[in-house]
Regions:
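Short, compositionally biased low-complexity segments
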Residues: 8-24, 56-60, 88-93, 123
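Short acidic (Asp/Glu) and glycine-rich catalytic loops that position anionic groups and cofactors
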Residues: 19-26, 63-65, 95-97, 129
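Amphipathic alpha-helical blocks
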Residues: 35-58
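Conserved pre-motif C helix in the palm subdomain of viral-like polymerases
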Residues: 69-99
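Conserved catalytic palm subdomain of right-hand nucleotidyl-transferase polymerases, strongest
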Residues: 27-29, 112-133
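Short, glycine/acidic-rich hinge or "gate" loops at secondary-structure transitions
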Residues: 98-107
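Non-catalytic, polymerase-adjacent accessory regions of viral genome-replication enzymes
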Residues: 1-43
Length: 133
């Protein structure tokens, strides 16, 4: 049976996405500005998603100097909430299709897990030939 999303469930899912989007950014002015009208903002996003009229706003461009100079295009906070909503809906579907050696942005598969897997593969393929990581 197919899952039927209701507008009320969409609003609850948007609130959960908002909590994820604001993590580690609670003191940023754009988060506080969004939070001042939280329910109105979430309802506005929910309405536009529900009616298929949602359009992302232009990104903010800035230069980061460290660790190397580069141009960064940052999404507006309301769009980040939608990104988290989309991720929450789809990540399990996609992660099931990834090979075991996919590590980027997957819970429980960080750099330490990747290093352990690499070491295991090296030892298997080198027939225990001396190699130190």
């Amino acid at each position: 049976m197919a899952y039927r999303l209701t507008k009320k469930a969409l609003l609850a899912d948007l609130y959960a996405a908002f909590l994820c989007a604001k993590k580690h950014k609670v003191n940023q002015p754009y988060v506080k500005h969004f939070e001042n009208r939280l329910m109105e903002n979430l309802k506005e996003i929910a309405d536009s998603l529900w009616n298929h009229t949602y359009k992302p706003e232009p990104s903010t461009c800035f230069i980061v100097e460290r660790p190397k100079k580069r141009e960064v295009f940052a999404a507006q906070f309301r769009d980040r909430v939608v990104h988290h909503l989309y991720y929450n809906y789809t990540h399990e579907i996609f992660e099931r299709t990834f090979i075991a050696d996919t590590y980027s942005c997957i819970k429980g598969r960080g750099s330490h897990y990747g290093i352990r897997r690499m070491k295991k593969h090296i030892l298997e393929e080198s027939h225990n030939y001396l190699f130190k990581l």
